[in-house]
Amino acid sequence: MYLTNYILFCCFNAKNIGYFFGNYLIKKEVLFKRIVNFVLRNNSRIFSAKSVYDYILNEGYTCSINTVMNFINYLKEAFLIEEIKQYSTKVKRELSYFGKLYDMDVSSNSIRADRNRFDIEHNLENIVFNELIYKGYKVQLYNLNGYEIDFRCEKKSKIIFVQVAYSVVNESTYNREMKPFSLLDNSNEKILITTDKVDYSTSTVRHIELEKFLLQEDI
């Protein structure tokens, strides 16, 4: 957390910006700031370097996809973001071309919110991701027949599947979050994490309130 805040300070404080750019030999400072803001503001979303590249072109800047990838790698090296890949059931490996980016400090998104329009859903997913990493899990995206499960989590021989939602009080939201679970067998635990106080556990899915999840040593 302290390293993240320090890097943010160096990146965006006018008096210290030279330190960060000097270490990474970045010459296109304005372009770098644009990419940083875009990436940190779009956490917990499907990511590709091409999508960032297209955004930059649309903003009127010119650069190469390699430049975008290099800048994103700098953010990873500075522990500002973490990238996870999709787990493939067919080839039993990660799909290197498909993934999401998560902010190591979720406030990196909030301080960039437009007119205080905080992105609660994606930030909540980001918070759960950070906590799963802290609890020692290897975390991957999971897709089964076109239905996305937020996280496939593995630690030693333990595998769990996790869905995250702000609330499932609405029936359509509940059905959307639970549908992917119904396509899995029951050999591994399935967990739904929300802010709801009501217990939505079923015979095959365990519901955990967010606050309790954050206070647990493990799941």
Where are these regions (language model features)?
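Active-site ExK catalytic segment of metal-dependent nucleases
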Residues: 158-170, 177
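Accessory nucleic acid-recognition modules appended to NTPase machines
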Residues: 4-156
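Hydrophobic, well-ordered secondary-structure elements that form the walls
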Residues: 132, 162, 181, 190
